[in-house]
């Protein structure tokens, strides 16, 4: 799967979680099921780029564990970063994901249908994979799976797996290559430059 396609489907994955009410007792699959119709309606009605960025910033952040995502994407390099570097990395990576998602949403059809599969969840479980099948007109159905963990504020996503390709693993390879070339500060500058380019 190309980077462009990965960005597009993870953009859809992000928006599928954007309208969940922050209810601690809600099962993770119910969070996804409860929002699909509203999300598809918004995609169909609103294609304004700025509005989609605002939507992602206001809604997506609440349902994604960006700190854990950043830790996983950095791998062993996370522990080598200083606290200020860790904060800068998390902030830059969060902005990168939000803007990537909002850009991808512009390409998503309002006729998308998402089938959510109930996970095998036992009492006391704090980690779960919620599997979904996305159907878009003119395309083969594809899988988007959410790795989620239970936090004090409810279930949060810490990885998105598209056709068996992990989002954080996908970023880890490019991040490690950049760190090898220019160090952690160099990686921060590269991510921030991408964010500025997307904003402009």
Feature map (PLM): residue ranges:
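Short beta-strand edge/turn micro-motifs at domain boundaries
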Residues: 141-169
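Early exported N-terminus immediately downstream of N-terminal targeting peptides
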Residues: 25-105
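N-terminal signal peptide c-region/cleavage motif recognized by signal peptidases
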Residues: 18-20
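Bacterial N-terminal signal peptides that target proteins for export
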Residues: 1-11
């Amino acid at each position: 799967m190309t980077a462009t396609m990965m960005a597009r489907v993870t953009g859809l994955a992000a928006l599928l979680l954007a309208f969940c009410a922050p209810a601690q007792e809600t099962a993770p699959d119910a969070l996804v099921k409860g929002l699909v119709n509203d999300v598809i309606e918004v995609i169909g009605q609103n294609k304004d780029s700025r509005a989609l960025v605002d939507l992602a910033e206001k809604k997506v952040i609440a349902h994604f564990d960006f700190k854990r995502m950043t830790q996983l994407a950095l791998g062993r390099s996370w522990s080598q970063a200083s606290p200020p570097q860790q904060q800068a990395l998390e902030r830059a990576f969060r902005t990168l994901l939000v803007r990537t998602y909002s850009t991808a949403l512009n390409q998503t059809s309002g006729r998308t249908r998402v089938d959510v599969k109930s996970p095998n969840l036992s009492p006391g479980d704090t980690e779960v994979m919620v599997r979904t099948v996305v159907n878009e007109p003119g395309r083969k159905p594809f899988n988007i799976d959410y790795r989620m963990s239970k936090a004090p504020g409810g279930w949060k996503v810490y990885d998105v797996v598209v056709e068996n390709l992990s989002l954080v693993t996908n970023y880890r390879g490019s991040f490690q290559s950049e760190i090898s070339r220019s160090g952690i500060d160099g990686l921060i500058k590269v991510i921030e430059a991408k964010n500025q380019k997307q904003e402009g």
